[in-house]
Amino acid sequence: MTSGAPCLLIDAGNSRIKWALVQAGGSQIASGALTHGGEHQPDWLSLPTPGGAWLSNVAGESVARRIAALLEARWPQLPLTTISACAQQCGVTNSYTAPHMLGSDRWAGLIGAHAAFPGEHLLIATFGTATTLEALRADGCFVGGLIAPGWTLMMRSLGEHTAQLPTLDASAARGLLDGSTRDAARRGPFFATDTPRSLSAGCTLAQAGLVERMWRDLQDEWQVPVRLVVSGGAVDEVASALKVPHTRHDSLVLSGLALIAAGRAAERGA
């Protein structure tokens, strides 16, 4: 990566691709997102040439090929580094029995969270295609995590595997979770009076209940305050039902990628 040049960061998740172009000092020049499939293209035409691109990809080889083609079309021969989890990096220690098996998005998110909230014990909840929880001690030790079906996947699964329940997508479910429904669910107990609202509210509360349970359990086990950090595509819906304090951060993975890139550049003396 060229010294002093901006860096292109790419977070390829299961539902969409997020990207950001950042200065060497960390300030953001531009950012955007696109869905999977060829109909959407990133708005890179007006951007300066980066020194390199850094990719976290959990969406598979076809998405990796698409990203490589997009980069080659805009910036031929641009260096591309695809990250993977490791045992230790940027002040975070990975306690997975096989560290490389941890998803690169979760790894970058842990690094981003550790830097964003220094000296704090964290529970990181990410509401994407899957809902993931990560327990991160203040010293940077990632002790482990949980993976559950995401909010949208949970609703779709019920619709596809039952005879009479509707299949709700995120847009339809959001329309059912209006302000009064969310307020009632937060006050609790909440019981809906039609099937679509029963499904959307039930899946929302299932997500919130998992997070609240683990946040309380973690504080009981560690006997210290734990900050709950939330993010992801369904964060608005799930966070609206949470009854515990939480902090939203929408760019943990990209922030972690920036730190990984900066650390690698420092190692190389770039």
Swiss-Prot record:
Cofactors demanded by this protein: NH4(+); K(+)
List of residues binding ATP: 11-18, 129
Entry-linked CDD domains: ASKHA_NBD_PanK-III (cd24015)
Pathway field: Cofactor biosynthesis; coenzyme A biosynthesis; CoA from (R)-pantothenate: step 1/5
UniProt EC number: 2.7.1.33
KW Cell inner membrane (keyword) present: no
GO biological process: coenzyme A biosynthetic process
Primary subcellular site in the record, as a coarse category: cytoplasm
NCBIfam families named in the record: baf, PRK13328.1-4
Protein name stated in the entry: Type III pantothenate kinase
Species of provenance: Paraburkholderia xenovorans (strain LB400)
